[in-house]
């Protein structure tokens, strides 16, 4: 155990020169799998940004003749029930889906990690009050929370992100709290406190690196679900309105045709899968890079 | 420990009150008209207005809130569903039998399939087992539940005819496909969390020390590594159980299972206030109890956490 | 862990025991139902789902049998004066528990239903007076054309004795006069009915809705449309009216299956918000710019027909000549000319509000694409059912939409479809749903409602068409797909399957 404590100090010393962030990035860059994940993500984001200019067809152009057209050279991914080109819709849909998915994941994670560290570090009354409030919030069905947000705050991109992220916060807090509880009383933390490290510093450079792993795993796996969820928000005044494509909505539109025209579901499904895959590759790398036990 | 549990149980009272007030307020500000779903699409605006008046929906917020709290906490009456005309509590319990079976079976699958998969992956880090396990896990979290469910139905019910397509009238057979479809994501996430936290622990110095001491792989794994990797796993299981007892709408819809999820979603969509408010309260109670259970299990798994519960002052 | 396992095992065993072995006796039929009826008590509102089981569960005083109105429980209807009618019952009606049905039960049912307030049409019943054992006298406050029939058809009838014997107001176990009795109701899942061997009516006098050609009927609630198709393919259900249009070809002309197509009584129509589109030319331009053929192709897989007014053409008060009239057929030239006349230029934006459903989304998207051809933007505002209901009728929300996609139908008269949105007396703010306060429109609809003579009907129709406050798009068609166990599918006037009247 004492070895770990020394290891932590070592990190602390180096961070003075390089900064902890830089160090993590340095290790992350050396992780091939993570870099592949990151590159694909960047490609997807670039496609999303450029989509208005590079889609093969207009994403909203309907055509009676092309209804449910199967994949072909004209339409690589086929066409949907309104004869719209699925490839173009996926490319354009990346804008809303990636933006909403990533942003709400980030918001949920940041808020969740902040609350989780507070709760885990201070324990006692803080823990009890915050966790009971989370109990209350988690008891409310997500759909109702979203409707309430839409009704009280109105529509708009910010509120959509709020509606999508609010459901992910309690899980993040709980995971982090659980991990922090196990490291909270370890010797190296107490040692850090004894040498008068600031609380912020104890949390950010000693507690979090040792307890964040479950959060990274859960966050990177949750993004697929978040993208799917966005589809249900468009009925309650939030989210993206048709015909602007969005992967979750494309999937749910194709749902009733799934046995008849499976390509309506398969391609947006694959797109979501690709994002989940990349984020997981990246997340695994990040976790390893942040793990103080895994030094080169 | 007993004191801690007692204190937490006492905390349930403000939590329940909080849930009641919050859900009531949310239903109050949510637009949507219970009268219109009761009277159907052919009712005119004048007729709807009369029905709303009769239902007491035009009273001021504070009057309705007071009435609701009095009903719930003094008379212990959750009210009667607008749509079903039967008691909310009875309705919820009737639905709960199906949800409970699904939740228990799914959690069993998740724990007994997901955990070993995760351990296998961690101990063979970057090996074949790891790759297969992680691929399955990624499939699990990225395949939408409805897609998996419909594919299973197509294969096992429509083409092979082994199992019913939907419904609950065929005993256990009715629950096989829903449970598989529903637990796939859970197994995946369980496997991944287990792998991740096992990896974390395996890299720890004391495991290295234990191995160096010449202890057998198995002993190290199950006596030293697993218990220390359990905390995130318990969190996931606890959270998953709490969520699943709230019902899984997608699976219940696809398989036409009259579970809690469909009951609540229908109620939300038709603004069946008594069902939504009563259901949220009961599910919230169950959820809080499970979270308490999770905290208690933490203490059993890790004595350090127990010490924290029992008062930090003595320790500091 | 052992305890946990044994708990699971115990649960599993309890469940498998509870699953009943279906006793194969006589003919039985399983009907797939998309909506959940919920409370099946007699005096509930007409929510979706309920309508599917209504005629199997209950009998009314009167029903619509084909195109004619016939007494079901009622033997004779006598007019006393304009607002007073005597209803004579058959004198041998008994319910499933053996209670005799008399005039006092009629009084009880109408009074209870009116007090419950779920059947708003009954508000025009002033009182019911018991004249003798089998004659009840109805006093009405007002009667427009067709009102008498719809009132007598509206209220399900049960005996007071049976109703009061029920612990939950018959929410789960109704005892009725119908030939089928509920024997098992698994809420949210299945409702099973057994034929009542002692059904009161003589065969030759039995109306279609009360026929009983099969021994056992099970309604199975299957909310997912793909699963409805799967259940029929696996022959777990015998018939369903909720098979999505694009899957119909899987059953048409396929061995072991058959499809019956019947017109649905609902019609999709557009309502223009007068506050934001006060110019008739502008409204007409939009109507001409939308191609209904596209809508039928995209939203209904080619199965549906052009509406000729706000409502379909199957109602008795529909005027035949409208079928041959030009009614906002797609016309590019006219649309362009009218847009120009109204001063609408490219870049203009309309907000289209609709109730979210697959077909509505597609209709809305088609309209959006059609107007897009003129450089006009359409913002789609979909709402779920509860929210749409609120926005549709809420005066304060009317500033948030320009065009509304709505649908409506009636069990008897076209005027009742018009009334839903076009009679300002039925709105809380004294205008139509489209915020039109047009005295001429109001006087014409009142005339048509009071007396639905072809002249009155035509006058209103022509004025509405000319002003284009609202216009009909598509009348839907119901697809009844069934296994060959059912040799002839039968439906009620509301387009719902009548399992007892199907032939086997």
Where are these regions (language model features)?
Chain C
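Structural transition elements
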Residues: 8, 304-341, 359-360
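Periplasmic binding protein-like
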Residues: 31, 372-424, 455-456
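N-terminal lobe/hinge region of extracytoplasmic solute-binding protein
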Residues: 32-80, 88, 111, 175
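A structural "hinge/loop" feature
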Residues: 34-52, 73, 99, 147-156, ...
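Surface-exposed binding/hinge segments that line
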Residues: 78, 82, 120-163, 168-169, ...
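Aromatic-rich, solvent-exposed beta-strand/loop patch
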Residues: 96, 139-156, 175-224, 248-266
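Periplasmic-binding protein-like
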Residues: 277-316, 362-363, 461-474
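Extracytoplasmic/peripheral linker and loop segments enriched in polar/acidic and small residues
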Residues: 379-388, 417-484
């Amino acid at each position: 155990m004492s070895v770990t404590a020394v290891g932590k100090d070592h990190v602390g010393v180096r961070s003075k020169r390089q900064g902890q962030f830089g160090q993590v990035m340095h290790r992350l860059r050396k992780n091939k799998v993570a870099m592949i994940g990151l590159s694909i993500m960047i490609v997807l984001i670039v496609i999303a940004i450029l989509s208005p200019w590079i889609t093969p067809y207009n994403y909203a152009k309907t055509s009676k003749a092309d209804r449910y057209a199967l994949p072909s050279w004209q339409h690589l991914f086929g066409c949907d029930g309104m004869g719209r080109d699925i490839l173009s819709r996926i490319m354009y849909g990346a804008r809303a889906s990636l933006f909403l998915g990533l942003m709400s994941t980030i918001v949920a994670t940041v808020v969740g990690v902040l609350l989780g560290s507070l709760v885990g570090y201070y324990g006692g009354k803080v823990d009890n009050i915050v966790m009971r409030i989370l109990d209350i919030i988690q008891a409310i069905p997500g759909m109702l929370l979203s409707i309430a947000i839409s009704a009280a705050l109105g529509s708009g991109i910010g509120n959509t992100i709020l509606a999508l992220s609010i459901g992910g916060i309690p899980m993040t807090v709980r995971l982090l709290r659980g991990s922090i509880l196990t490291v909270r009383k370890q010797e190296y933390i107490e040692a850090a406190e004894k040498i008068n490290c600031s609380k912020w510093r104890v949390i950010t450079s000693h507690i979090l690196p040792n307890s964040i792993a479950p959060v990274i795993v859960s966050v990177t796996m949750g993004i697929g679900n978040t993208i799917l969820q966005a589809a249900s928000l468009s009925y309650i005044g939030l989210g993206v309105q048709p015909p602007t494509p969005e992967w979750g909505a494309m999937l749910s539109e194709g749902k009733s045709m799934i046995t008849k025209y499976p390509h309506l579901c398969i391609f947006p499904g694959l797109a979501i899968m690709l994002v989940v895959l990349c984020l997981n590759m990246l997340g695994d790398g990040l976790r390893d890079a942040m793990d103080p036990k895994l030094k080169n | 420990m007993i004191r801690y549990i007692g204190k937490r149980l006492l905390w349930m009272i403000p939590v329940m009150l909080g849930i009641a007030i919050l859900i009531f307020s949310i239903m109050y500000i949510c637009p949507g008209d219970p009268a219109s779903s009761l009277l159907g699409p052919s009712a005119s605006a004048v007729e709807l207005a009369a029905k709303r008046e009769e239902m007491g929906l035009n009273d001021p917020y504070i009057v309705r809130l007071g009435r609701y709290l009095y009903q719930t906490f003094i008379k212990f009456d959750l009210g009667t569903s607008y749509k079903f005309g039967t008691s909310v509590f009875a309705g919820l319990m009737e639905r709960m039998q199906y949800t409970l079976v699904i939740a228990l079976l799914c959690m069993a699958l998740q724990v007994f399939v997901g955990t070993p998969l995760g351990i296998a992956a961690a101990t063979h880090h970057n090996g074949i087992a790891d790759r297969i396990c992680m691929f399955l896990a990624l499939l699990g979290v990225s395949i939408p539940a409805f897609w998996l469910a419909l594919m299973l139905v197509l294969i096992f019910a429509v083409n092979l005819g082994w199992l019913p397509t939907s419904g609950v009238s065929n005993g256990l057979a009715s629950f096989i496909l829903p449970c598989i479809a529903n637990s796939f994501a859970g197994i995946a996430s369980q496997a991944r969390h287990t792998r991740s936290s096992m990896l974390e622990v395996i890299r720890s110095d004391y495991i290295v020390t234990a191995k160096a001491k010449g202890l057998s792989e198995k002993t190290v794994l199950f006596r030293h590594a697993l218990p220390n990797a359990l905390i995130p796993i318990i969190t996931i299981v606890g959270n998953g159980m709490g969520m699943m007892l709230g019902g899984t709408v997608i699976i219940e819809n696809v398989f036409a299972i009259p579970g809690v999820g469909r009951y609540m979603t229908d109620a939300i969509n038709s603004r069946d206030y008594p069902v939504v408010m009563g259901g949220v309260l009961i599910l919230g109670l169950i959820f809080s109890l499970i979270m308490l259970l999770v905290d208690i299990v933490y203490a059993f798994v890790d004595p350090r956490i127990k010490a924290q519960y029992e008062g930090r002052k003595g320790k500091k | 862990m052992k305890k946990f396992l044994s708990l699971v095992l115990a649960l599993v065993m309890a469940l498998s025991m509870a699953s009943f072995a279906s006793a194969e006796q006589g003919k039985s039929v399983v009907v797939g139902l998309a909506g959940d009826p919920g409370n099946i008590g007699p005096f509930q509102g007409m929510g979706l789902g309920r309508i599917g089981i209504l005629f199997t569960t209950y009998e009314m005083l009167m029903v619509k049998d084909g195109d004619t109105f016939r007494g079901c429980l009622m033997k004779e209807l006598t007019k006393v004066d304009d607002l007073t009618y005597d209803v004579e019952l058959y004198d041998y009606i008994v319910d499933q528990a053996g209670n005799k049905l008399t005039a006092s039960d009629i009084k009880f049912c109408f009074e209870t239903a009116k007090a419950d307030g779920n059947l708003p049409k009954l508000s025009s019943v002033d009182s019911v007076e018991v004249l003798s054992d089998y004659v009840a006298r109805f006093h009405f406050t007002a009667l427009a054309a067709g009102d008498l029939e719809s009132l007598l058809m509206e209220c399900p009838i049960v005996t007071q004795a049976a109703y009061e014997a029920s612990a939950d107001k018959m929410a789960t176990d109704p005892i009725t006069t119908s030939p089928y009795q509920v024997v098992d109701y698994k809420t949210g899942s299945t409702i099973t009915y057994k034929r009542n061997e002692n059904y009161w009516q003589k065969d030759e006098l039995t109306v279609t809705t009360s026929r009983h050609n099969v021994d056992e009927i099970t309604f199975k609630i299957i909310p997912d449309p793909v699963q409805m198709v799967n259940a029929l393919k696996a022959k777990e259900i015998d018939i369903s009216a909720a098979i999505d249009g694009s899957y119909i070809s899987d059953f048409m002309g396929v061995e072991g299956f058959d499809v019956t197509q019947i017109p649905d009584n609902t019609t999709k129509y557009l309502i223009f918000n007068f506050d934001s589109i006060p110019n008739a030319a502008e409204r007409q331009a939009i109507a001409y710019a939308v191609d209904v053929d596209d809508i039928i192709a995209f939203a209904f897989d080619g199965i549906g027909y052009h509406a000729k007014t706000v409502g379909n053409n199957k109602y008795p008060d529909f005027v035949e000549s409208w079928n041959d009239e030009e009614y906002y057929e797609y016309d590019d030239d006219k649309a362009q000319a009218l847009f120009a006349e109204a001063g609408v230029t490219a870049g203009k934006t309309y907000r289209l509000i609709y109730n979210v459903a697959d077909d509505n989304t597609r209709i809305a998207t088609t309209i959006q694409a059609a107007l897009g051809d003129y450089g006009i933007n359409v913002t789609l505002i979909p709402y779920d059912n509860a929210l749409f209901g609120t926005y549709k009728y809420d005066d304060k929300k009317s500033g948030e939409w320009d065009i509304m996609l709505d649908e409506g139908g009636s069990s008897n008269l076209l005027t009742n479809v018009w009334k839903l949105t076009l009679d300002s007396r039925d709105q809380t703010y004294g205008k139509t749903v489209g915020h039109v306060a047009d005295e001429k429109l109001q006087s014409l609809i009142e005339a048509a409602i009071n007396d639905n003579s072809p002249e009155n009907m035509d006058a209103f129709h022509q004025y509405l068409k000319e002003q284009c406050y609202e216009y009909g798009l598509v009348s839907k068609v119901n697809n009844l797909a069934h296994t060959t166990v059912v040799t002839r599918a039968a439906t009620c006037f509301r387009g719902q399957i009548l399992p007892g009247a199907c032939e086997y």
